Amino acid sequence: MERECGSKELFSKEELQEISGVHVGDDYVEVMCGCTSHRYGDAVARLKIFSDGELQITCQCTPACLEDKLTPAAFEKHSERETSRNWRNNVWVFIEGDKVPLSKTVLLRYYNKALKNSNVSKVIHRDEFVGCSTCGKERRFRLRSRGECRMHHDAIAEPNWKCCDYPYDKITCEEEEERGSRKVFRGCTRSPSCKGCTSCVCFGCKLCRFSDCNCQTCLDFTTNAKPI
């Protein structure tokens, strides 16, 4: 997904000055974060906040940990927090040396805005996977915007789709696919590990059907809906 690099300041210097580990990128702000398990202690990580509301966490719980691009809910589970499913309060950042839940910071501003907009539209698309025709490995596609939906739509329509066609990163068949424990997290707003419900499975809308596509699915939809 392409973002407008450096298009605006996500947070003011005053809002970030007391937060530990701040790094400001072209299209994101990154901070130190963590989640505490009463049994295993603190799992420390890096949280990236994007202007479109996306939150990505790279875990640093051990030097050998390779978990990255986790959702906060997935990171909460990975840290083996005993009382999970409340990542807004369980995932924290350091502010003036104290652990402060994300819910009590400004860092969820864009996430909450995106969530509010998605609830208004009532069109939620969970992440989907497309398998490589060569190696069989499955690659994740996010379906949050019309452009992302089109990339996924074109990928599943191509019988010879390969890892090298993946639109987000330059990858080959040598790259490992996501672990099964991560695949269950597909972006449902009701339940992080949802297997498919009426809130995250769409059977056709103006976001994921295209008037310039000649597949039967799009043709059936656009004959009964005004194209956008």
From Swiss-Prot:
Q: Which PROSITE patterns match?
A: SAND
GO CC aspect terms: cytosol; nucleus
Q: Which UniProt keywords apply?
A: Cytoplasm, Developmental protein, DNA-binding, Nucleus, Transcription, Transcription regulation
Q: Residue ranges of the SAND domain?
A: 14-121
Q: Where in the cell is it found?
A: Cytoplasm; Nucleus
Q: Name one Pfam family in it.
A: zf_ULT1
Q: Name one GO molecular function term.
A: DNA binding
- Give expression by tissue: Expressed in influorescence, pollen and siliques, with a higher expression in influorescence.
Q: What does this protein do?
A: Putative transcription factor that acts as a key negative regulator of cell accumulation in shoot and floral meristems. Negatively regulates the size of the WUSCHEL (WUS)-expressing organizing center in inflorescence meristems. May act by down-regulating expression of WUS. Can compensate for mutant ULT1 protein when overexpressed.
Record's protein name: Protein ULTRAPETALA 2
Q: What is the lineage of its organism?
A: Eukaryota, Viridiplantae, Streptophyta, Embryophyta, Tracheophyta
